[in-house]
């Protein structure tokens, strides 16, 4: 492997996965070598969004059209994504981070250990405060859970205290953060977490 850390980013449609990648690329690229793989079923919309935002040079972003279930493309048959990651690692070695964004999926989404070293799962407050207690691999087993769009809590009647309590119960000590990626809340904490996971940076 010619990248130090492959990071999977998953979560339901509209939760903020692409916004997370945009934010992380902009905050990390001055100090680290980064590349990104995005997944969409029939288009390369997320890749084009990141390219148009100029978060990285165009060659460092690859869009994968999965043509089917987002979960299958990151778990059962991850060959398309694996090939895209290897392509980027061969083109831009050595890389510090390769981010792999799954297409929008449900709470059962999880990455193959052959594809990524760790996973981030993103949910958002607008789906309701019951989401953390519904469980699923994304909630309970991801290496980092993000509860995004906390600014919408009052508008959708979501109780952040309930979400906090349920998340702490479901996560059993695993890290998680409240975030508002549009204003930068939580970005520093996410960045520190990722930096701590780089093999050479671990104590």
From Swiss-Prot:
Q: Name one GO molecular function term.
A: GTP binding
What Pfam families does this protein's entry cite? Answer: cobW (PF02492)
Q: Which gene encodes it?
A: ureG
Q: Which InterPro entries match?
A: CobW/HypB/UreG_nucleotide-bd (IPR003495), P-loop_NTPase (IPR027417), UreG (IPR004400)
Q: Where located?
A: Cytoplasm
Job description of the protein: Facilitates the functional incorporation of the urease nickel metallocenter. This process requires GTP hydrolysis, probably effectuated by UreG.
By what name is this protein known? Urease accessory protein UreG
Q: Which GO terms describe its biological process?
A: urea catabolic process
Report the sequence similarity comment from the record: Belongs to the SIMIBI class G3E GTPase family. UreG subfamily.
Q: Does the keyword Chaperone apply?
A: yes
GO cellular component terms? cytoplasm
Binding site residues for GTP: 11-18
């Amino acid at each position: 492997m010619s990248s130090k850390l492959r990071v999977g980013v998953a979560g339901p449609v509209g939760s903020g996965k692409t916004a997370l990648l945009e934010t992380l690329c902009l905050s990390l690229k001055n100090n680290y070598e980064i590349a990104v793989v995005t997944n969409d079923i029939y288009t390369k919309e997320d890749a084009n969004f990141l390219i148009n935002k100029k978060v990285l040079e165009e060659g460092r972003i690859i869009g994968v059209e999965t043509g089917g279930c987002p979960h299958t493309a990151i778990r059962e048959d991850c060959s398309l994504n694996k090939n895209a990651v290897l392509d980027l690692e061969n083109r831009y070695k050595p890389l510090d981070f390769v981010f792999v964004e799954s297409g929008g999926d449900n709470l059962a989404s999880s990455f193959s250990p052959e594809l990524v070293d760790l996973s981030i799962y993103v949910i958002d407050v607008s789906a309701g405060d019951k989401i953390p207690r519904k469980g699923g691999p994304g909630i309970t087993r991801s290496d980092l859970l993000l509860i995004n769009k906390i600014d919408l809590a009052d508008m959708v009647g979501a109780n952040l205290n309930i979400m906090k309590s349920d998340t702490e119960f479901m996560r059993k000590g695993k890290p998680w953060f409240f975030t508002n990626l549009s204003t930068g809340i939580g970005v520093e904490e996410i960045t520190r977490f990722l930096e701590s996971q780089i093999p050479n940076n671990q104590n």
